[in-house]
From Swiss-Prot:
InterPro entries registered for this protein in UniProt: aa-tRNA-synth_Ic (IPR002305), Rossmann-like_a/b/a_fold (IPR014729), S4_RNA-bd_sf (IPR036986), SYY-like_C (IPR054608), Tyr-tRNA-ligase (IPR002307), Tyr-tRNA-ligase_bac-type (IPR024088), Tyr-tRNA-ligase_bac_1 (IPR024107)
Primary location group: cytoplasm
Family classification: Belongs to the class-I aminoacyl-tRNA synthetase family. TyrS type 1 subfamily.
GO CC term (a single one): cytosol
Annotated ranges, domain S4 RNA-binding: 350-416
Family matches, as PROSITE patterns: S4
Motif residue range(s): 'HIGH' region: 44-53
Catalytic activity: tRNA(Tyr) + L-tyrosine + ATP = L-tyrosyl-tRNA(Tyr) + AMP + diphosphate + H(+)
Record's subunit section: Homodimer.
Molecular function per GO: ATP binding; RNA binding; tyrosine-tRNA ligase activity
Annotated function: Catalyzes the attachment of tyrosine to tRNA(Tyr) in a two-step reaction: tyrosine is first activated by ATP to form Tyr-AMP and then transferred to the acceptor end of tRNA(Tyr).
Taxonomic lineage from the root: Bacteria, Pseudomonadati, Pseudomonadota, Alphaproteobacteria, Hyphomicrobiales
UniProt organism field: Mesorhizobium japonicum (strain LMG 29417 / CECT 9101 / MAFF 303099)
Record protein name field: Tyrosine--tRNA ligase
Enzyme Commission number(s) from the entry: 6.1.1.1
Length: 417
């Protein structure tokens, strides 16, 4: 990686964000001489972003922090189709109402990460439905479609994957990359946007936009992608025992979010501190140098700093305090995740297997049984060895809850409802 002159690209390089850049020298010179507008696109396929999206959102933060202007593009139009990149099947089509609801949910996270306003480098949020839904089909084919080579589009990895597996790729999905390329041109015209950023799986789509801009007479456009983020053991990030790691607290609690980062593998701590926190690099180097059990302190800092960015400092501190009380003092913290159980069902008795699934500590009865056989399950801090164990009202603590635990770090309170 070259020694960048601009603050933004130097920050991106030092913190490990860069996978590919379409023209390193040209983009570096552009950042060094003027305020640059750049964007990341987010399709509204759910009511929240997940931690995979946090990488690109953090890039937008550093873009603004180094004096440039970020755009968060909501895919209100492209979400009507769905991105086929590296998928085995076609996405379910969403209604306009569902997309609008999803966009409202996604907006919440950006309010914590970016500064919005009317200043020269204040962030803006735009929706590609504003131009895509107004297109005339025949004019679009004539003015835009003629610049795309089907032969070249068929060589993109995201398309080849589907075709090589002899899986259907609809004409609807095939058009997605054309629309994404056109988004770049529209933002160049409307907002003088010169750079699109995204994950490495979006490289082909972004380059389409760079090439389309050249053919349609925009100023030089640029592409920058991040590496696919995996753990040191090779696992793709973003999944937990409870499913996807969402950024909105109503889908994945701040406590669970904190715990996700606290459970980071030792080998990943330095890399994740660089990418997901705003700590100075010398402080990160100090934390990364900790050995033995001291590395756990670095993991706690990673968890607290990342949770503070996504959920706010108060929620992060509360999550850290809950963990401390639960693990270090053995106390029953009232901020642990909670699920309700029907009181009548508890009176009759609820099987431990189904209760573990309900609590999100297992994905199936089979997985719950394996946890019990492995000695990982406890009720009120007492080990469970019988997978036919029934949980009843007799198990309620003085606080009127049943504490379910999986291993040392995962706890859920069951309350009669």
């Amino acid at each position: 990686m070259p020694a960048f002159k601009s603050d933004f690209l130097r920050t991106m390089s030092e913190r490990g964000f860069i996978h590919q850049i379409s023209d390193e020298t040209g983009l570096d010179q552009l950042f060094a001489k003027e305020t640059v507008t750049a964007y990341v696109g987010y399709d509204a396929t759910a009511t929240s972003l997940h931690i995979g999206n946090l990488i690109s959102a953090t890039m937008l933060y550093w873009l603004q922090e180094t004096g440039h202007r970020p755009i968060a593009l909501m895919g209100g139009g492209t979400s009507m189709i769905g991105d086929p990149s590296f998928r085995d099947d076609q996405r379910s089509l969403l209604t306009p109402e569902a997309i609008a609801t999803n966009i409202e949910g996604i907006k919440r996270i950006f309010g914590r990460i970016l500064r919005f306003g009317d200043g020269p480098n204040d962030a803006i949020m735009v929706n590609n439905a504003d131009w895509l839904m107004k297109l005339n089909y025949v004019e679009f084919l004539r003015d835009v479609g003629r610049h795309f080579s089907v032969n070249r589009m068929l060589t993109f990895d995201s398309v080849k994957l589907r075709l090589d597996r002899e899986q259907s790729l609809s004409f609807l999905e095939f058009n997605y990359m054309i629309l994404q390329g056109y988004d770049f041109v529209e933002l160049a015209r409307r907002q003088n946007c010169r750079l699109q950023m995204g994950g490495s799986d979006q490289w082909g789509n972004i380059i389409n936009g760079v090439d389309l801009g050249h053919r349609m007479g925009t100023p030089q456009l640029y592409a920058l992608t991040t590496p696919l983020l995996t753990t040191s053991s090779g696992a793709k990030m973003g999944k937990s025992a409870k499913g996807a790691v969402w950024l909105n607290g109503d889908l994945f609690s701040p406590y669970d979010f904190w715990q996700y980062w606290r459970n980071t593998e030792d080998a990943d701590v330095e890399r994740f501190l660089k990418i997901f926190t705003r700590l100075p690099l010398p402080e990160i180097a100090r934390l990364a140098a900790l050995g033995g059990s001291e590395i756990n302190e670095a993991k706690k800092i990673l968890a607290t700093e990342t949770t503070a960015i996504v959920h706010g400092r108060e929620a992060a501190n509360q999550a850290e305090e809950t963990a401390r009380k639960t693990f270090e003092e053995g106390a029953l913290a009232d901020t642990l995740p909670t699920v309700g159980a029907d009181k009548a069902a508890l009176e009759a008795g609820i099987g431990i297997l189904s209760l573990l699934v309900t609590a999100g500590l297992a994905s199936s009865n089979g997985e719950a049984r394996r946890h019990i056989q492995g000695g990982a399950v406890r009720i009120n801090d007492q080990s469970v060895s019988d997978d036919r164990r029934m949980v009843t009202l007799q198990d309620l603590s003085p606080e009127n809850v049943v504490k379910l635990s999986l291993g040392k770090k995962k706890h859920v309170l069951v309350r009669p409802a």
